[in-house]
Amino acid sequence: MSTSSNTSGECSPFSITDSIVVQATDDNADKILQEVDLSDPNIDKNDTFELRQQVSIKESPLYYLRDIPYSAYTSFQVSLIFLIVIYNGFLGPLAGNVFIPALPLLQKEFNVSETTINATVSVFMATFSISPLFWGALADKGGRKILYIISISLMVIINILLASVPKKIGSLIFLRIIQAFASSSVISLGAGTVADLTPPKDRGKAMAYFMLGPNLGPILAPIIAGLILLDNNNWRWLFGFLCIVSGLGLIMVILLLPETLRCIVGNGDRQWENWSQNENDMSTQPVDFSSPISRWSFVSDIGFLNPITQDSIFKGLYPHPPKFSVWTYLRIMTFPPVILTSIANALLFCTYYSISVTLSHFLATEYSYSNLKIGACYVCPGVCMLLGSQIGGHLSDSMRKSWKKENYNTEYPLEFRLILTVCGVLLAIGGSIGYGWCIQFHYHISAVLVFAGLMAFGLTWCNNTIMTYLSELLSLRVSSAIAVSSFFRNIAAAISSALIAKLCQKMGIGFCFLGLGLINLVSLFSILVLINNRNKWVKDSF
């Protein structure tokens, strides 16, 4: 690679030579100019996150950072980290969904109306929607692991208190609020960890794998609840079980999870800790990071950490996000791509939670099902949620890869990922409408579950794609971006769970879910507007 010398006394730490320059924002999201000799046969022109970089600092000789991988962790270590975040990602939705099959029982136990007992779901979802804004802001600056430890520890304590709560509805609602605050961290923290470890070209399926945890909540929670509620006096063990599984997650985090936030640990290579721009030591020797040494070790990285080095190259490769403020969230919330995708996702969640909350009630009253049968019926939409996320995530990455092969010198339009959501929204609309009329006319339970499954499939198909899109769009604020999206969708879920019983009474079940289905045409419109205006809105620095 030919180079040009830099003779100025003050210049950017990354001088430009006469080699071809590639902007790394396409596949890396790290704000740095990388120099690439495209004649080098070892360089994959479609894989710009692992490049041979040549960096010139002021007047000093060139230092070589060879083939820096996106992540320094081995496949086994990445799999282990994914296992931990998937498991802990399961805990939040588990806490919310294990409660739902018990609503008819708890209504009798606490001697309250259906609307009042549904309020315990509403306050949980409302808190679950707002709290990630707090966790996400800290996670993008202070680190992932310490927030996992704090939030899961709080989950353990609150579940102990819930298991012994007196039969007073006020106490139950209060503790559910605290439970929601603690458990709301796991999705934004997990999504941030996934983005730390996986490059954008693999981000869709990586997010799909992570979402196995959150999506398993709606599948396993009703079954677990049904088994626990075989004896109606055992409803307190719902929270005892949550305490046990949360404690297991906390142990895994403390013992095995490393810090992954890129502005603190970079790509996880331990060599960064002992490396800096030292001309006396490095003027004649290239610095080779192609054989990284991962920072993974037992019981490590506990606490709020500083960057492992103050070196300017490290800071250029792995920049800190701008200082957080309330205005940061307001700017993110009002950024058109974020608000449009969040509205689309929120309306889908509104419809899904209306189905989820009413299904147990209708199965008990209209079909005379036992608690165990009710729990088993939730398996169908739960499995469909898994399938929607996995198929959508893998297909999204496959379409991206095909596009890059044909346009390898062109930056991939991130909004192209959202094309897939059109199919998901249409499936969700059909599922909602079919579910309502099947209940209205008391059709066979298989028809009810098929339409509920279609709604669940369409929801996660869209949700996975939107999360992947946001993680690429706001690469320095991944947890915050996911938190904003979660805020909108969980607020919508809270409102729907609070009002759905009265809406069904006033409108009739069929017309109620017809309206909920058709309102998702707004979701479809939002996505189409974003795709058609993809060049209009330029990503700002958040």
UniProtKB/Swiss-Prot annotation:
Localization annotation: Cell membrane
Source species, domain of life: Eukaryota
Glycan attachment positions: N6, N46, N111, N118, N274, N463
Membrane topology according to the record: Multi-pass membrane protein
Gene3D superfamilies in alphabetical order: MFS general substrate transporter like domains, Multidrug resistance protein D
Chain ranges passing through the membrane: 80-100, 119-139, 146-166, 169-189, 210-230, 237-257, 332-352, 374-394, 419-439, 441-461, 481-501, 511-531
Consequences of knocking out this gene: Leads to intracellular accumulation of acetate and decreases the ability to kill Galleria mellonella larvae by decreasing proliferation in the host hemolymph after infection.
One Pfam family cited in the UniProt record for this chain: MFS_1
Keywords: Cell membrane, Glycoprotein, Membrane, Transmembrane, Transmembrane helix, Transport, Virulence
PROSITE patterns: MFS
GO biological process: ascospore wall assembly; plasma membrane acetate transport
GO annotations of cellular component type: cell periphery; plasma membrane; prospore membrane
Induction: Expression is up-regulated during internalization in hemocytes and in the presence of hydrogen peroxide stress, but surprisingly, down-regulated upon exposure to acetic acid.
One GO molecular-function entry: amine transmembrane transporter activity
UniProt record similarity statement: Belongs to the major facilitator superfamily. CAR1 family.
Main function: Plasma membrane acetic acid exporter, relieving the stress induced upon cells within hemocytes, and thus enabling increased proliferation and virulence against Galleria mellonella larvae. Confers resistance to weak acid and oxidative stress, but not to antifungal drugs.
Record protein name field: Multidrug transporter DTR1
Organism listed in the record: Candida glabrata (strain ATCC 2001 / BCRC 20586 / JCM 3761 / NBRC 0622 / NRRL Y-65 / CBS 138)
Originating gene: DTR1
